């Protein structure tokens, strides 16, 4: 097993650690391909990147980014679209070029767009893929039961995911959360040279245990990371609390 597991005290330390990894990659390789994620977890990391860009002038002008997923049916300017999230939390604060930003399109011709995104991904291998972790073990929006062979696809969200995201982003309003999404598949995620997963808090402890100590199963999508040659997992004490080894 090639997982490098880093246990830190809390969310702030986890974000700092992840930031160090991303920053040193961008400095070493100014035209790096970054696979990016949304959700509540990377928010502090993105803040640190913006601050560092402002203060230390770390440049993203030759960086390309590829986001994991997008809700289906939200317009770009919807405040909860991932497109909007990424612009607000990261892109508008750094010197990345608009044309270097890639996010799946969550409306219109699904099949064509998935095909186009897959082509883009296979032409641009990611140097690093940032991941959060769903409380049910999903990565991107690859819900439990998704085949490990998938590339970018349309997926119906599980009840638990709708609930989690309602609580975090939609003021608890289940009806406001889109019921489906477009996501990079497990196959696309596994193509990245390095995978960096951050998980914090008690509600992730079960999934973290399965991901690291459980069997590799499509019922817990993140468990596939055990088969990747270069994975860094950053977890806080709460998320690590059920680990036995
Ligand atoms: N599609 C996203 C994932 O990319 C994210 O990693 C996960 C965890 O979210 P959070 O970081 O808010 O716990 O759930 C969301 O549904």
Regions found by a protein language model. Give the residues of each.
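N-terminal glycine-/serine-/threonine-rich phosphate-binding loop
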Residues: 1-34
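Ligand-binding beta-strand-loop-alpha-helix segment within the catalytic cores
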Residues: 1-2, 58-129
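Glycine-rich N-terminal segment of FAD-binding domains in flavoprotein oxidoreductases
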Residues: 28-54
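ATP/nucleoside-binding phosphotransfer catalytic cores, i.e., glycine-rich phosphate-binding loops
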Residues: 184-187, 191-245
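A glycine-rich beta-strand to alpha-helix segment
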Residues: 32, 40-41, 45, 120-147
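Short beta-strand segments
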Residues: 35-39, 67, 104, 130-133, ...
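A glycine- and small-aliphatic-rich helix-loop capping segment at beta-alpha/alpha-beta transitions
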Residues: 48-59, 82, 144-153, 214-216
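Class I SAM-dependent methyltransferase SAM-binding "motif I" and its flanking Rossmann-like core
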Residues: 140-186
């Amino acid at each position: 097993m090639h997982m490098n597991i880093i246990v830190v005290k809390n969310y702030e330390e986890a974000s700092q650690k992840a930031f160090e990894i991303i920053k040193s990659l961008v400095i070493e390789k100014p035209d790096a391909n970054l696979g990016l994620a949304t959700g509540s977890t990377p928010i502090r990391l993105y803040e640190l990147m913006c601050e560092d860009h402002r203060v230390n002038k770390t440049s993203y002008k030759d960086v390309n980014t590829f986001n994991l997923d997008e809700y289906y049916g939200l317009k770009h300017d919807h405040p909860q679209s991932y497109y909007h999230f990424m612009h607000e939390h990261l892109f508008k604060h750094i010197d990345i070029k608009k044309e270097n930003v890639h996010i799946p399109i969550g409306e219109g011709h699904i099949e064509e767009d998935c095909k186009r995104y897959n082509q883009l991904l296979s032409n641009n291998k990611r140097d690093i893929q940032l991941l959060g972790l769903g409380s049910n073990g999903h990565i991107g929006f690859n819900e439990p039961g998704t085949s490990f062979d998938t590339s970018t696809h349309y997926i119906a969200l599980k009840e638990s995911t709708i609930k989690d995201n309602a609580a975090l982003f939609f003021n608890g309003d289940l009806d406001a959360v889109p019921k489906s999404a477009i996501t990079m598949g497990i196959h696309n995620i596994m193509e990245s040279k390095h995978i960096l997963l951050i998980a914090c808090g008690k509600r992730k402890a079960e999934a973290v245990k399965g991901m690291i100590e459980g069997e590799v199963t499509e019922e817990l999508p993140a468990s596939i990371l055990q088969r990747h040659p270069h994975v860094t997992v950053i977890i806080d004490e709460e998320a690590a609390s059920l680990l036995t080894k």
